[in-house]
């Protein structure tokens, strides 16, 4: 049986740990499992929720973020999560059931049909900044950010993974992302969680 080591990193969200298996998790996109019902699409996510103390699972390109439920002691949960991840990656089990092979649970462009075609150039600038400046930083913290729309000067975004329940996520949206977008795209007046 091959030897494997899973690295663990803390995230700004104290309830979430980021697990790095040292190999590709998602070939494209990301996947958020905010509850056990959503996790039914993935045997690994379902097994993590079956531990009982897990309240969220998120797959990034080369990491898996696991969020513990309220009051859960990571010193007890972490070895169980690592054991499940090792078993999954060493045995080569599929990440998803059936045709649902990859990508995010909610398409990244969900809500874009509401974008005004007259704002196409502005929306393209916003998406470019999110893709090149924001997503890499958010992924580094064990999460992702998804564009949901631009209406009347307001950019709507969804935080996923470690970022979804993080106490500092609203500060990240307002002070970090909103400041960046307003600086480069003057038409942006505000950023809100969608």
What annotation goes with each model-predicted range?
Residues 1-194:
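Domain-level signature for proteins that mediate thiol-based redox and metal-cofactor handling
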